[in-house]
Regions:
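Gram-negative bacterial Sec-dependent N-terminal signal peptides
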Residues: 2-25, 585
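Catalytic glycan-binding domains that act on GlcNAc-containing polysaccharides
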Residues: 227-234, 262-264, 269, 322, ...
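Alpha-helical solenoid repeat scaffolds
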Residues: 13, 21-463, 469, 489, ...
Length: 614
């Protein structure tokens, strides 16, 4: 049945709900406070609502959200009065606060902002809160962001600029960044707020002239570097440095690493580089395996990048390549301490450690699992999840996920593992992983790395001649085992196969393309496609993983002319999504291999060497 039709907003329903004994957003008596990770579990017991009430709230939610965005204050107030303490209410309140801030309704804004849990307050609402109080604490950090900000944060930065509360160098660097990202209107507004508009002979006008080399089309020109060289005498050190950083970034992302380094090396003020530019400066040196140069680049990165396990690991590798094993070990220790990510695992292996997938906690107590399942906030998420499954409603499923994250965000580690068990038993697999993944000391790898549908997956992996651990590593990243998962571009199911690809596969292996929408058919198609990608890409798992995400042609284009270490290939993939995807899939596969007692449990060996382009 159509939930929107059945549960449409009506004044009578709202009035009845207000008079009912539901929990209001101001009722904090039933909330479970955050607990120390060392405390024993105290299972929350928030008031439960009936299924019809949960679905009623969901039916009204989208209308209330639309009302919040258009500033229909009465409708929003009516919804919040009866919606209870939920992710739905929190989302609506955030949207309403954005609208109130945009309209300058500061008295109502301040009143409603107090009702919002700080953990759920979105960045734009925080910006409006500072505008409402005349504070500019966030502006100093926001001005260092060189791409588009939410409207409220843009207003905060411009207000701080007008009040003379920003570092001038940072502010003009943001103007350049906006210009390079085609955000000309925001760049113009900030320049005006700084008192130097783009018109006339002001600094703003000189910044605007940089579009001739840093604009999205201009930087692609073969003459961009010569144009910048001819302009340099009229540019400040900061302007010139930023512009060379833009050109270096473009060349590095197009795998022209020698040229990229030559441009980056003309940057005289490296404080002008954005994080993205700095990382690609390092990737250019990494791809060419210029270890001395790489270590120097990493050591000049801002603190936040130097603390990233990516660059801790590669700094360690660069020290090792230069023969400094003691300093290399120090960096590996730092990277290995960052968790269970790609570089933590690789760093651990450099220190002689292999991943350990032995649980250090017992399974959750069955009584605790039952009590957790009865918690009102958990139950709300489960109601939405089960109804989304039966109706194949992707939007409702996303809201169920939001409610689960809302319900568990203050949980200690014991409760997270109990919640993960509840989710697993209800086949809410993605949220089982979400909860289990958030523990740091109490570890249950069977919940972190779930393996549902195992008989089917292993059977089709074996038929395709590929490693089941690799298949599970890919499914965990693609869909988190959500049966009806559908991407924004139309990829379907557990293995996120595109319908057009499914038709092609079906014709080759004697299936109906409609089997894409079944568990069995989706896994069969996905494993066949993985094997085909591997065969087409020189039998290399790393390239096949990249090809599964971005297409085999791109994976082939990213090869070097000579063999390249798999981790270097992965780190220098130009697409952020694919770069992260490959690292996560291969890390997942290594953990699954350990859980499945396979012999291949080294991530470095699994990454191997990517052959040269032929």
């Amino acid at each position: 049945m159509n939930a929107q039709r059945i549960f449409s907003l009506s004044l009578s329903l709202i009035t009845a709900a207000v008079l009912s004994a539901c929990v209001s957003e101001n009722d904090t008596s039933s909330k479970e406070p955050a607990s120390s990770l060392t405390e024993p579990a105290s299972i929350p017991a928030r008031r439960a609502e009936g299924e019809s009430k949960v679905l009623s709230d969901y039916g009204q939610y989208q209308g209330a959200l639309d009302a919040a965005k258009r500033g229909d204050d009465m409708w929003v107030q009516q919804f919040l009065a009866q919606a209870g303490d939920s992710a739905m209410a929190e989302t609506v309140r955030n949207e309403w606060l954005k609208s109130l801030g945009a309209r300058g309704q500061w008295d109502v804004f301040r009143q409603e902002n107090k009702k919002l849990n700080a953990a759920g307050r979105v960045q734009e609402v925080q910006c409006y809160a500072e505008l409402s109080s005349g504070s500019y604490n966030m502006a100093a950090e926001l001005v260092r962001v060189t791409n588009k900000l939410p409207a409220g944060c843009t207003r905060l930065v411009e207000s701080a600029a007008s009040a003379g509360r920003l570092n001038s160098n940072d502010a003009w660097r943001r103007v350049r960044g906006l210009l390079s990202n085609s955000q000309t209107s925001d760049a113009r507004s900030l320049a005006a707020a700084l008192g130097s508009p783009f018109e006339g002979g002001s600094q703003g006008a000189r910044e605007y002239s940089l579009l001739n080399v840093i604009g999205k089309d201009a930087r692609k020109s073969s003459s961009a570097a010569s144009t910048l060289s001819s302009m340099e005498s009229g540019l400040s050190r900061e302007q010139s440095s930023f512009a060379w950083g833009v050109l270096g970034l473009y060349q590095a992302q197009n795998q022209n690493m020698q040229t990229a380094l030559s441009y980056y090396n003309r940057v005289s003020d490296r404080k002008q580089l954005t994080d993205e530019q700095f990382e690609w400066y390092a990737r250019a040196a990494l791809r060419l395996q210029r270890w001395n140069e790489l270590s120097g680049i990493i050591q000049q990165m801002p603190d936040n990048l130097q603390k990233d396990p990516t660059w801790q690991y590669w700094l360690g590798r660069s020290y090792a390549a230069q023969g400094n094993q003691s300093r290399a070990k120090d960096m590996y220790e730092k990277a290995a301490a960052s968790g269970r990510n790609f570089y933590a695992v690789l760093a651990g292996e450099e220190l002689g450690r292999r991943i350990n997938t032995k649980n250090n906690v017992s399974d959750a107590d069955k009584k605790d699992v039952r009590r957790m399942a009865d918690d009102g906030a958990i139950k709300r998420a489960l109601v939405l999840f089960k109804n989304s499954q039966s109706s194949n409603d992707a939007k409702m499923r996303r809201q169920a996920q939001a409610e689960w994250r809302f319900a568990t965000r203050d949980f200690n580690e014991d409760n997270l593992l109990t919640a993960a068990q509840v989710a697993f038993e209800n086949q809410f697999y993605d949220m089982a992983i979400n909860s289990a993944d958030r523990t740091e000391r109490k570890l249950n790898y069977n919940l972190r790395y779930l393996s549902p549908f195992k008989e089917t997956t292993v059977r089709y992996a074996s038929q395709a001649g590929i490693d089941p651990a690799w298949v599970y590593g890919l499914i965990r990243q693609e869909s988190r085992f959500v049966m009806g998962a559908q991407s924004s571009v139309g990829a379907q199911g557990l293995m996120q196969v595109m319908p057009a690809t499914a038709r092609e596969i079906a014709g080759k292996i004697g299936m109906s393309s409609s089997e894409l929408y079944t568990m069995d058919g989706n896994i069969r198609m996905g494993t066949w496609y993985m094997a085909d990608a591997k065969r087409r890409l020189q039998n290399n798992e790393v390239m096949a993983t990249a090809g599964y995400n971005a297409g085999p042609g791109r994976a082939r284009n990213w090869q070097a002319s000579t063999p390249l270490e798999g981790a270097i290939y992965a780190e220098t993939i130009p697409f952020t999504e694919t770069r992260d995807y490959v690292k996560k899939v291969m890390t997942n596969a290594t953990y699954y291999a350990s859980l499945f007692n396979e012999p291949q449990t080294s991530l470095k060996q699994r990454m191997g060497t990517v052959p040269g382009r032929y």
